[in-house]
């Protein structure tokens, strides 16, 4: 059995001495079978719409998944940044960036056998006063934070976005939105 271990910038420097290992695969005896080192200075340069401490060491993979060809897809989070959910990065087996989307994707992702990537995302919705066709007010003075699932082709092309808020709105369970503690974060 093999285990996929997440790392980050400057982690496991014995194995990845320049930038650290973003992830590595080990067997049950602890032998490292493969690792991914990425030039984090290049990877994390010019992330748009991000405030806070944007040094590479403040970014880390919060979700990782292997691709069918031995590459890796990572959901990147930020410490001391706003927003904290940064986006998705696909790297090849050698640690080269294949594609990246700084689109507020976050946490646990999944890669299907055909290479399709499924990743949760967060988006800010401005001007929404009610949830769907209900009488439930959002009570937001600022943007509403909504979640969804992004579906990506193996080449990184966005195929579809599935809004979880819209799915609940259109279901027979839209009344669940009435019990929200804060109307800005369903």
Model-derived features with residue positions:
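Histidine-/acidic-rich catalytic cores in large beta-rich domains
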Residues: 1-186
């Amino acid at each position: 059995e093999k285990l996929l271990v997440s790392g980050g910038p400057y982690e496991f420097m014995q194995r990845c001495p320049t930038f650290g290992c973003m992830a590595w695969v080990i067997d049950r005896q602890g032998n490292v079978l493969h690792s991914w080192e990425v030039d984090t200075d290049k990877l994390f340069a010019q992330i748009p719409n991000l405030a806070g401490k944007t040094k590479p060491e403040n970014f880390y993979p919060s979700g990782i998944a292997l691709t069918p060809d031995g590459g890796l897809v990572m959901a990147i989070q930020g410490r001391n940044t706003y927003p904290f959910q940064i986006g998705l990065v696909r790297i090849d087996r050698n640690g080269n960036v294949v594609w990246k989307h700084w689109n507020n994707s976050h946490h646990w992702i999944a890669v299907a056998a055909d290479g399709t990537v499924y990743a949760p995302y967060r988006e800010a919705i401005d001007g929404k006063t009610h949830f769907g066709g209900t009488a439930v007010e959002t009570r937001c003075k600022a943007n509403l934070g909504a979640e969804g699932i992004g579906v990506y082709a193996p080449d990184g092309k966005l195929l579809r976005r599935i809004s979880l808020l819209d799915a609940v709105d259109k279901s027979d369970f839209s009344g669940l939105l009435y019990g929200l503690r804060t109307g800005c974060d369903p």
